From Swiss-Prot:
Disulfide bonds: none annotated. Pfam families: Hydrolase_4. The gene is ABHD17B. The keyword Membrane applies. It is a lipid-anchor. Keywords: Cell membrane, Cell projection, Endosome, Hydrolase, Lipoprotein, Membrane, Palmitate, Postsynaptic cell membrane, Synapse. Hydrolyzes fatty acids from S-acylated cysteine residues in proteins. Has depalmitoylating activity towards NRAS. This is Alpha/beta hydrolase domain-containing protein 17B. Belongs to the AB hydrolase superfamily. ABHD17 family. The active site is at residues 170, 235, 264. Its main location: membrane. It comes from Gallus gallus. It is found in: Cell membrane; Recycling endosome membrane; Cell projection, Dendritic spine; Postsynaptic density membrane.
Length: 288
């Protein structure tokens, strides 16, 4: 305890193990579902129905390229999964874990746009308690959810680990880092990542306590795949320093993308975002 800073002591003794700041910044915020999944009589085919709030930006032909289904996690929840076929000759599939305030319906248009531009298919899923997924969101469920998605991606579609890019955005970097620390893949992309919950709420925190949540900082060094980190320099939710700290701990970091002036929710609106992803997928991975 002698090495604790004053602010850390305050955290420990004045704010018990689940500080309000962590909840306010990192709480799960599932929106009202923006889609439904309807199963046919055979029980094997699911149809995606999007609400107006999903803000679908493409035609029905593009929507036909989206396959949805349900799978069960080790915690007993049924989670919704989405496979977006963006390119017939795609070498890689992104296993995409989205942020904390959206669901698959809201992300579907983005997935089509992203995948078609970087020549990748995209597989995503909703966390427990999000969209059509059952259960409640929690850290333990995050890990069980991505494990179920990983198994479904490999068994249902026969996609090998060397053709999977694990992509996490914001809270989605938590299950992504956990999975990538246990399984090798083609690469890992961390978009606006956090080091840990306590470090977001209390920036002066220097170590990981037993009650800390989402300890990416302690897991990232176990990732043996190439890691690309993307972070906005003006991120108002997860400070830019988190991306830097994770980059410094990577075994196999590639050139990061620090988006000058970008915040937490607008990195993808900057031109260099797509440019960096294209270069990473089409050029750098070939030589790694």
């Amino acid at each position: 305890m002698n090495n604790l800073s004053f602010s850390e002591l305050c955290c420990l003794f004045c704010c018990p193990p689940c500080p309000g700041k962590i909840a306010s910044k990192l709480a799960f915020l599932p929106p009202d579902p923006t889609y439904t999944l309807m199963c046919d009589e055979s029980g094997s085919r699911w149809t995606l129905h999007l609400s107006e709030r999903a803000d679908w930006q493409y035609s029905s032909r593009e929507k036909d390229a989206i396959e949805c289904f349900m799978t069960r996690t080790s915690k007993g929840n049924r989670i919704a999964c989405m496979f977006v076929r963006c390119s017939p000759n795609a070498k890689y599939t992104l296993l995409f874990s989205h942020g904390n305030a959206v669901d698959l319906g809201q992300m579907s248009s983005f997935y089509i746009g992203l995948g078609s531009r970087i020549n990748c298919n995209i597989f995503s899923y909703d966390y427990s308690g999000y969209g059509a997924s059952s259960g409640k969101p929690s850290e333990k469920n995050l890990y069980a959810d991505i494990d179920a998605a990983w198994v479904a991606l490999r068994t249902r579609y026969g996609i090998r680990p060397e053709n999977v890019i694990i992509y996490g955005q914001s809270i989605g970097t938590v299950p992504s880092v956990d999975l990538a620390a246990r399984y090798e893949s083609a690469a890992v992309i961390l978009h606006s990542p956090l080091t840990s919950g306590m470090r977001v709420a209390f920036p002066d925190t220097k170590k990981t306590y037993c009650f800390d949540a989402f300890p990416n900082i302690d897991k990232i060094s176990k990732i043996t795949s190439p890691v690309l980190i993307i972070h906005g320099t003006e991120d108002e939710v997860i400070d830019f320093s988190h991306g830097l700290a994770l980059f410094e701990r990577c075994q196999r970091p590639v050139e990061p993308l620090w988006v000058e002036g970008a915040g937490h929710n607008d990195v993808e609106l900057y031109g260099q975002y797509l440019e960096r992803l294209k270069r990473f997928v089409s050029q750098e991975l070939v030589n790694l």
